[in-house]
């Protein structure tokens, strides 16, 4: 992934999940992982760990980045230190079509509220889905199939006090208690150090 014309690039989203009992190994590779992200920081729009329900322990990651094509995107993922070290239990790579980004304001206010990654299958969407609290929206977009022809999932990163507020702010018709609709998920997320810190 050398220097190329950024206007010729597509966006991709990669969601990873760590294997069980790998936290110690993850810490050993973390510095190399952060250096890798800093190396490509001009291509990365958002990146950071997915956290457990307590918002403390990393259990995976989510990154939106630019690449020339699917092969270039796969190369970015496969050369990432966590991937090479065998720490990742699963990797989901999709094309991404972003709608908006409000990253600076979100960074400024992240201390007063957490960030949540919300995803919902396109098949489970219904008329009237919307954002009840647009001020809490950091970014949104659609994951796409490998040929960039079909949307597969609606993705939103939102700022909220807890998962219940995130659920209500994204899709007001989601139940406040109980399980999310089929094909939907809300997980805690935070901006990664490699992206929010100086190179």
Q: Where in the sequence are the language-model features?
A:
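Conserved, structured core segments of small domains
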Residues: 2-199
């Amino acid at each position: 992934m050398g220097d190329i014309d950024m206007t010729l690039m597509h966006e991709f989203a990669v969601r990873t999940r760590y294997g069980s009992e790998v936290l110690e190994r993850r810490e050993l590779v973390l510095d190399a992982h952060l250096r890798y992200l800093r190396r490509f920081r001009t291509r990365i729009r958002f990146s950071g760990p997915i956290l457990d329900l307590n918002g403390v322990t990393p259990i995976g990651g989510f990154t939106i980045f630019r690449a020339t094509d699917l092969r270039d995107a796969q190369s970015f993922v496969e050369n990432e230190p966590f991937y090479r070290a065998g720490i990742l239990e699963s990797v989901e790579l999709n094309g991404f079509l972003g709608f908006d980004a409000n990253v600076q304001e979100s960074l400024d206010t992240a201390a007063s509220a957490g960030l949540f990654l919300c995803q919902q299958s396109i098949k489970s969407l219904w008329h009237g889905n919307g954002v009840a609290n647009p001020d809490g929206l950091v970014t949104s977009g659609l994951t796409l199939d490998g040929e960039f022809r079909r949307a597969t999932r609606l993705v939103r990163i939102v700022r909220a006090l807890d998962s219940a507020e995130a659920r209500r702010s994204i899709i007001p018709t989601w139940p406040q208690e109980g399980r999310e609709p089929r094909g939907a998920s809300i997980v805690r997320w935070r901006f990664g150090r490699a992206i929010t810190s100086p190179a």
